[in-house]
Amino acid sequence: MSEPFKSGFVAIVGRPNVGKSTLLNHIIGQKIAIMSDKAQTTRNKVQGVYTTDESQIIFIDTPGIHKPKHKLGDFMVKIALNTFQEVDLIYFVIDASTGFGRGDEFIIEKLKNVQTPVFLLINKIDLISPEDLFKLIEQYRELLDFEEIIPISALQGNNVPNLLEQTNANLEIGPMYYPKDQITDHPERFIISELIREQVLQLTREEVPHSVAVVIEGIEKNPKTEKLTINATIIVERSTQKGIIIGKQGQMLKQIGMRARKEIESLLGSKVFLEIWVKVQKNWRDKEHYLHDYGFDREEY
């Protein structure tokens, strides 16, 4: 007789840049969470769905927890903390190469107040010696009663199968919430805007901070050629940032568009014509109506 089907919700938390999105994308096998080495790149709860014959795990990738500096930051932290209460299991991801930091202390204090079981995932183990890894495990073991402590490399996939096995063991019998072939519940528009934003952050590096939002104005399909036309607007806070994104003779914007288009085509499996505009909206991160317009919906959280 076959085992009963199991399912559950798992939150992935940790301070910025520890590899949460990399882990989620490795498990799902497709890029659904924006990846960049800048802090705070994941803004909304991106759900990834991992389904096998035995179980379904719904992953919630939360923003990196940090001390908020403005309304957007405050909003991001609130999402992460609310998520702790809603899930069946929490992955607390840390970066082995940077060791214990104040950000980790802040998260552990929050985790002490929840009943949800917590897995400590020590990521980037390929960057430290076994001796240092052992010391790190001992250090964290004294801070919280973790359900499991699992060293991994999210980038290379080391020990991820073991992590999924342990996760399954902690799930309850439950329904299949999503169709087997569905990997995220985020609408395509959201993922397309995130793919464009990822290229902006990667190509402009430190020059353009997180005062960037991307709004998809329209998606049209040509019935004859099946080609998609996507109109997008990049929103920044200052005209200097607009200049950086457009670049000399429009070269930077061209690069952003070219790279984003390839990612979008690979996601949607069809040819895309991508048109991008850049618009200045001063201090949008501190104005609630702008946050709502750019996809940050307070009602949802």
Swiss-Prot record:
One of its GO terms (biological process) is ribosomal small subunit assembly. It is a peripheral membrane protein. Residues 61-64 are annotated as: G3. CDD domains: Era, KH-II_Era. Residues 204-282 form the KH type-2 domain. Monomer. This is GTPase Era. The gene is era.
